[in-house]
From Swiss-Prot:
Record's keyword terms, sorted: Mitochondrion, Oxidoreductase, Transit peptide
GO molecular function: oxidoreductase activity
Gene Ontology CC terms, in alphabetical order: mitochondrion
Name of protein: Putative redox protein FMP46, mitochondrial
Organism of derivation: Eremothecium gossypii (strain ATCC 10895 / CBS 109.51 / FGSC 9923 / NRRL Y-1056) (Yeast)
Record has Transit peptide as a keyword: yes
Function: Putative mitochondrial redox protein which could be involved in the reduction of small toxic molecules.
Catalytic residues identified in the record: C93
The protein's Enzyme Commission number: 1.-.-.-
Stated family: Belongs to the FMP46 family.
Entry keyword annotation includes Amino-acid biosynthesis: no
Gene: FMP46
Length: 133
């Protein structure tokens, strides 16, 4: 099987960034993803703050949603990629005022879609089924 064929068979990845998967917006997002993402989607839950590269990409997709969840977004986008905030546990980022408690963000990396609640999942992804990791 060729590499291209192998890649075509891989599910699309949707990442949910949340301090706790079963609390607040994250719970709502995961519930919506169960019914709204396609069968070729794989949902990953990350309890770590995005890397600088991920944060830049996410803010290019929907800066308003990212800024609502990441209060110091403009400041963080100016920091070097090795700054301690990047890839730190979200629990620590909440204590440091970098991440809002009870919140969450979901990102469909391939389709360039991003939201902060269950409603955005339904509006942007429609409905079908998927797998959650």
């Amino acid at each position: 099987m060729s590499l291209l064929r192998t890649l075509q068979m891989q599910p699309r990845v949707i990442t949910v960034f949340a301090e706790h998967a079963n609390v607040g917006a994250a719970s709502e997002i995961l519930g919506a993803l169960k019914t709204a993402s396609g069968p070729k989607c794989k949902v990953q839950v990350s309890t770590m703050f995005p890397t600088l590269e991920q944060l830049i990409y996410m803010s290019e997709i929907n800066r308003t949603a990212v800024a609502a969840q990441v209060p110091r977004l403009s400041e963080l986008l100016q920091k070097p990629s090795f700054s301690e905030e990047f890839s730190s546990p979200l629990a620590q980022c909440t204590q440091d005022g970098v991440w809002r408690s009870q919140g969450g963000l979901w990102v469909d990396w391939e389709k360039r879609l991003l939201g902060a609640d269950g409603q955005s999942v339904h509006e942007l992804l429609g409905s079908s089924t998927m797998t959650i990791d």
